[in-house]
Amino acid sequence: MTDTSSFSRAVHRPWRGTLRAAAAAALAGAVALAPAAAWAAPVDPDPDATDAPVLSGEVTYAMAPAGNGIVDEGDSLTVSFVVNNGTLEAAEGVDVSLGLSDDALASRTSLSSWLAGDSSAQTDEIGATSFGATLSGAEQTARLTIDADDDALADREPGVYPLAATFTRGDDSVEVRSAVTVPDDGEVTPLTVVVPITAPAIDTPVLTAAQLEELTAEGGSLSSQLDAVAGTPVVLAIDPAILASIRLLGTSAPESALAWLTELDALPNARFALQYGDADVAAQMEAGFETLLEPGALTALMRDEDFTAPVEQQTVEPSEADTPTPTESSSDDTDTDPETLGIPSLEELLSVDASHERVYWPATGTGGSLVADALAEANGDDDASALILTESALVTGTGATVPARASATDTQLLVYDTDISRELNAASVESDTTLRAAPLAAASAYLHFAAEDAGEDPLLVTVDRASTERSRLALRAAVLAATQAPSTAASPFAGLVAHDPAPVQLVAGVPDDDRAYAAADMHADEDALARFATVLDDPELLTGPNRDEILQVLGNAWRGDESWPAAVSAQRQGTIETIDSVGLLPPSTVQLLGSSSTLPVWVRNDLPYPVNLTLYSQPEDLRLDVEDAVTVVASPASNTRIEVPVQARIGNGEVDVTLDLRSPAGVQIGSTERAEVYVRAEWEGIGITVLAFLVGGLLVIGLVRTIRHRRRAATDGDGEGEALEADEDDAEDAASATPQDDR
């Protein structure tokens, strides 16, 4: 027996006390045998300590066997113990006693009861160690090794044995539980492991280039996921939105993202596609959708220049016969011309080269009969090929192992083991190597019983989706714990699908009303957007990205995220703003002084695309005649002027003109506006009459003067003798006639 203890080390970063305490309790099976207050009295952190680590207010204890808890013949047993002080004061030293039962647990049900602290077992001490005082915010680790030739390990039959560590301080003690598995070298059970390839939660249609560069860089989330599954026989459940995000960038995609995509394509693993954005299929079915939402077109997010490649063309030097003058150009000279590769189709963007086309994986706990039956019905005539991935906890029964290939009436199922998958997922998100060993040991124990129950029938487990980022090492440890487990052998996905289904019955499940209502609301908004989008030559420029954004917001990565309601509200507000991006500007008052003119109307278009509109005008008074409909193409991101012909009929006064914009499909765009037109058409008639009277009067006066002048000229030939007299008479006549002419 070897006892190795580590000295206390101070924690200089915020310690995840609450999370780690929960992990130690849930994964290692911590059970308090003494009053909790004596061990973990909550302590309020010092409000004045700004640089101090965040403390849990508790002292926590954990225990985990190494090697996934598997002890084969000739193996030693190494167990780690952890004490973490999350209080403001130093914790006193504790003694640790390790006990192992001589009697194997009878079933997986008894294993669950043991780990949960609901049952007891007789354990004999096989080793002991101790801890000194643990400083505030510090953690201590000790390891105890039981040699292979120790009587406690010798000649054990295959099975799962209770393992317990008792932490004692004075008269108080806490017991932490785990299990040791002695494998059976007999028959092996076919095992299929499913691992999701998903991205963190986003509220945009696709991942940006910057996000992709970060996720696919060394140590990034997507890079870690791929590294963790490389070289293993797992089945990949891939979010096609990740692949589309890379492919739509074309030649402008980050190099790391292109390399990641190439590496994914090179993996020989079987795979199937999740819904776009790993959207919540249960929420859609519970919202009453007849079918699942399909991803929308991504054309609006692509650029032509990202899908051209330079093509080298050899420049052939002319021969001497054709060119008498030698040239200095070399035959190695080349020209580069762009070659258009073409915008990829949506199918090409989303392709994952799936081994099976219709596999639906509801989030854990949501794949009950209500959702599964709705999914099968949504596939209509194709329901025979649709497979719903659900968990054994939703199958009615006594907690025994459930066949991986099953059917509930006409619904075809792939059933993964809840207990094993839960422990594997817990291990995959635990960054601490020592604490990670606890759920891995529990997974091995459950897997032993599952293989024993299943015999030659296939088993299915998952390393489920994670709400937090997990490291490559943690995820790979969980994957290897399943794929390399004793008594199992990797089963191809095609073999699992082709296996005869066993009849089972699913429980209904509990609907998540909040997510169902959110799905219904966003879908209703989408219908309004689809009507508005008829202003475009290609409505999918708007509806496509919006649909993909909805699916991303419905993504399972948002589960448990407190900011998800805000993401839903932001998505709905964005749709409202898009619908409001085209409309009439409030018209100004117009003075109409003539019988005909134009009514200026301005159309606001905030979209980056030209929009097709028809302006309908309707006067509310017969004094004004307005052109009923004027068609216009409004320029993108600008205000466009429309001139509506108007004509006054009779009378003067104020006339309201109702203005409506409609799309070519007849959908009203924006709100109705009213233009005030002041008609002054009679002033024009009065002005013309006065002007005509003045012109006519001037013409008459001119004509009279001309006639009189000619008469006088005719009398000039009667004699020069009378000229003087005539001149005098004319002068007198003129003097007397002038006042009369003026009148």
Question: Where are the regions that the model predicts?
Answer:
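C-terminal region of N-terminal signal peptides and the immediate post-cleavage residues
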Residues: 32-58, 68-70, 89, 168, ...
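Catalytic grooves of carbohydrate-active enzymes
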Residues: 82, 220, 224-234, 335-357, ...
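Asparagine-centered strand-capping/turn motif at beta-strand->loop junctions
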Residues: 82-90, 602-607
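Terminal connector regions
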Residues: 111, 150-185, 567, 650-713, ...
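Intrinsically disordered, low-complexity Pro/Gly/Ser/Thr-rich segments with frequent PxxP/GP/PP motifs
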Residues: 115-153, 625-650
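Active-site beta->alpha N-cap acidic-glycine motif
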Residues: 178-273
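Membrane-proximal extracellular "stem/stalk" segments
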Residues: 537-685
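Cytoplasmic C-terminal tails of single-pass
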Residues: 711-743
